[in-house]
Amino acid sequence: MKRILILGGGFAGLECCLKLESYFQNNPEIELTLVSEDNFILFTPMLPQVASGTIETRHIVTPIRTLIKKTKFYEGKIKYIDPHGKSVTLYGTNENRGMLIHYDFLVVALGSQTNFFGMKDVEENSYKMNTINDAIILRNRIIDLMEQAENETDPILRKALLKIVV
């Protein structure tokens, strides 16, 4: 039995998993495992629509377990990758705390992080758009600015409150 472990349940990790499921669908000698911090896939290109309130968050998430057929799935956070011992330790959630997963082949598809290139002012005065929570925070801030502008009598201050840079 060969064990393929995929770390990351975003676009790359899930697509890799689905392709491997399809390729090895009739091969009982292959065991696929997917680990992700979330139990859902988030369609991040639609986060601006969530922030603007034009769609609801439920429209851009799909449970991972509904998409995979042959793959074991674990929701958890990676604590340690041991390339020599061919194992990954998870912090995990619920009953899977401290779990150790062995593999023969490892796919690392852990996504990306926003890089502000050391520009602290940009980092402190901008909004990231990576998660549903990020979109909700931005939406709430825009609503707050619009409420403030609605009640502002000074036209210069009102204009400043409504100035948003994208």
What would you call each of these model-derived segments?
Residues 1-75, 80, 161-166:
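Beta1-alpha1 glycine-rich phosphate/pyrophosphate-binding loop at the start
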Residues 71-165:
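FAD-binding core/adjacent interface of flavoenzyme oxidoreductases
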